[in-house]
Amino acid sequence: MKLLLKSVIFIFLTISVIGCLEKKPSKTVTENGVINVITPSDFKTNSVGQVIIDVRTPEEFANGHIEGAININLFDKNFESKLLKLDKSKPVFIYCRSGRRTATASKKASKLGFENVNDLQGGLQKWVKNNYKITK
């Protein structure tokens, strides 16, 4: 009986934690501007003609990325200096594989003075799940 109760509690906690990991669409007002977590549909529509930044490694980027994206690896020691070469007053659209690195990159961009940062909810995984194309 104890084993069954422990198993049920473990399953419930696992499902709860997994459900909380994916970021939901949201808007965070920062000192310098706003960070928007947006759906793949909104990202696709609103990023046309804008700066799209893929923060994954160059190897991940080479395996497929959103068309028109530039690769600025979050783990690169020059990540912030590369970001600063972009116009901070224009919207930027940032993504990674699942959304975790994007959250970090979005906060860094905002601290650097970017006024309108858009974070792809669920990253490239969710982009592909929505049947949107990637390019190599």
Where are the model-predicted features located?
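Rhodanese-like catalytic fold shared by cysteine-dependent sulfurtransferases
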Residues: 2-8, 18-41, 46-50, 58-90, ...
